[in-house]
């Protein structure tokens, strides 16, 4: 074969193939042996919970987790400080320049992802955990339907969009509790679409916004109690997470009010009363979850496991 055009095309193809394989390779290290005694992770998301509102909030369950766990109110968003791109970074361990989700409501990459996993989506924490343990039981329930396009739903055992509706989040809480009790998933998430709505409707830190926080805390308390009833509590790490904060009635820009949000870890193997004193970005979440389970992470991820939270 001596056709220069064909030869150049083949060279480009093989160069791309080698790059793709390298990007989707995994990284392992001695520290990634998992946290002893942990069988479950329960991740609870509060869309739009701003870091600067937590101290004044009536949230006894979350504050008890902070007092007995590791926490920061200054976990930084990626830019823009909007929802889909930040939740994508939570799941995918990188920023939008790599996963490609770059707008508030992105359901697919706004420009091509730098790498794709076996299910045709940038590798998520659900992808990684399924590869680590093909028999793992995972669950994702969410009030905002865009999550279903961000999680790699082919790698999730069960996922469902449950709108807030008139139940004001009682429906998703009850469904999540039922799944926990019946299936005892190793990794699961319940993502509330609040207090983001109150922020947009009345303003971040407004009276209506602050009134919503104890309601959400009560749902979190119900979930914690459910893990006790299911016999999961003693070997569960809880994660409380948000995607962004807000200012006035919006977010998406570059103020710290919009970019800083809480991240809390509570459970066995987690330091107690530890204020995380290292920089944390939204995309550090997925590598930390992988670290807890001892799973290898894709080489393409750029976040890091927050080693400082572990005892």
Features from the language model and the residues they span:
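Beta-strand elements within well-structured catalytic alpha/beta cores of enzymes
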Residues: 37-50, 65, 90, 129, ...
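C-terminal motif of bacterial Sec signal peptides marking the signal peptidase cleavage site
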Residues: 27-28
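Active-site His/acidic residue clusters
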Residues: 145-160, 174-218, 222
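Bacterial N-terminal signal peptides that target proteins for export
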Residues: 3-17
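Active-site nucleophile/metal-coordination loop of metallo-enzymes that catalyze phosphate/sulfate
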Residues: 34-38, 50-131
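Metal-dependent active-site segment of extracytoplasmic phospho-/sulfohydrolases and closely related
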Residues: 43, 61, 215-255, 289
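Substrate-binding rim/cap in mid-to-C-terminal beta-strand-loop elements of soluble/periplasmic
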Residues: 91, 254-296, 307
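Second-shell loop/turn segments in exported
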Residues: 48-53, 76-77, 110-117, 127-128, ...
